[in-house]
Amino acid sequence: MKFEVEKARLKWLLDDQYEVLKKSRAILAGGCVTSLFTNVEINDFDLYFRDKEGLSTQIAGMFSQEYGYYQLHHLTNKALMYIARGSDNPCQLIVFDFFKDAHAVFDRFDFTANMAAFDFETEEFVFHEDFWKDLSARRININPKTDYPIITALRVDKYKQKGYTISKAQYLKLMLMINSLEIDSWEFMRDQVGGMYGYSFEEIFKPQDGEEFSIEKAIEKIEKLSLIRERWYDKPAEFAGNNPEIKEIMEKWKDILHEKQIGWYNSKNVERFNQWTQIASSYNEADEGGIDWLDSVVTNPFDKE
């Protein structure tokens, strides 16, 4: 199956971003691809990367002529979400790990009905063996290897509202997965509940000075506070991922990404941008006009200086 109609629609939706994603060899996966095949409105694009070069190329591409200008929506230790100028669909770069192929991404997903991907390296769709049958039956089949089962539990309710069903056996499996987490610190608790799938509850579990962790205290915090989405754009996010290569990339880009949270590209960052990554320079030198586009940034209408 070639899925030429779906490929054409994807190109139309991504517009100029499509070529940048090809260069970064990204993998588009999850609900966005499911929505593409069920003719449902796409809310956002979840993008995964094979290696350091791919992620660096993608971030550099955001500043290129091909992308135009973008605005950062949020930055956590798991994901970076931005909205390209002129686009209605945010893109979320998954930055907590690298993935060699689409099936490596599926290994970390929670529902088989979302295990569909588009590989920009091959420009082909990839599917888990259970994807079509669970999607057609609107059935929640949980992957026991998923990274964040607490978030999965929250997503079960969301998918039930969409008409999906979950068996008692699957729900019990999910409860046992959560029970096996052995949550023993505020840091681990925050890691389990924040920064993915649009759920950001980390502020709730920030301890007071010297406050020791306990499940009872965590429950008290939930009872005292409404579950609110954290406003990531209020301040720079500290990247605390475990992968050292990803952490290196995100720490280098943190300041410039934060400026994007409060406005469009500022020419003060041009010098830092050139120094920070050779990937950025090599990417732009490969384009017509080299890196001359940086000179035009100073006078573009979005420049706040």
Name the predicted role of every residue range.
Residues 1-305:
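Catalytic cores of the polymerase beta-like nucleotidyltransferase superfamily
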